[in-house]
Amino acid sequence: GLDFGAKTVGVAITDASGTLAQRKEIIRRQRENALRKTYARIQELIQEYEISCIVLGLPLHLDGSVSERANKTLLFQVELERRTGLQVIMQDERLTSVEAEDLMREAGIPKSDWKAQIDMIAAELILQDYLNHRDRYQ
């Protein structure tokens, strides 16, 4: 599962049974469009964990309309499919950042550490939502 942001990509993977999402890492980049190393790291993760498809969060507005970030995410999806040869499934990610903040607050994580973890937690939530409802994609 991926949470594609302006300068980061949060990454989550599933457990061996494919039922539980686990946060993995955050891929950082210096500039928004500097994606070469991001694609390379995703390729490494695909090989390391034998990933067969990718779930990518789609940041729609609350009313369901497409945001500027969603347009950039859709372009990222196309390029990711081209580079990896894998299907990239788009998953609605509305309110995942709010949910991630709630989880960090409940876990007692200091606010100063939130920025370092929010994208990875959001990726985990995106992937878990897909896993919980994957029958609607088949």
Residue ranges of predicted features:
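Short glycine-aspartate micro-motif
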Residues: 1-3
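Phosphate- and other anionic-substrate recognition elements at nucleic-acid/protein interfaces
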Residues: 7-138
